[in-house]
Amino acid sequence: MKRAFFLVLLLAVAAGPVLAQESGDPELTIAVEAFRKALIDPTQVNLDKLTMNELTYGHSSGMIQDKAAFEQALLSGASDFVSIDLSQQTMHVVGNTAWVRHLFSAVTNDGGKPGETHLSVLMVWMKQKGQWRLLARQAVKVVQP
């Protein structure tokens, strides 16, 4: 009996990441992809549509921006993404709130200075009036081998 219990427990733990990935919402997946594209080609309209007024946007450097500062950095070119690749994405929806985790690799040209970044990102989304909008985002640097 103990053996069966531990086998079930092991299977439940192993299935956790798979279940989290499958508990997403197709509309949320579309919103995350739209946000990725908006970071590369930002406009006031697409950023406003995808983010909440209460946005808190945490960078891996420790800098935290509100919505206005986040948008200003993108629209001015101070933060300039040439390309972005998201991988190992998982998501979980709880009511009208969801979290999304992924690895974020980007080629940048911040203020005209070429570079690249590799991050682990956690995003919190809320569904308002049938649309997913970003409420919070926090990134940490990923050490590359």
Language-model segments: which ranges?
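A beta-strand edge to alpha-helix "cap/lid" segment located at domain peripheries
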Residues: Q21-K49, T56-P145
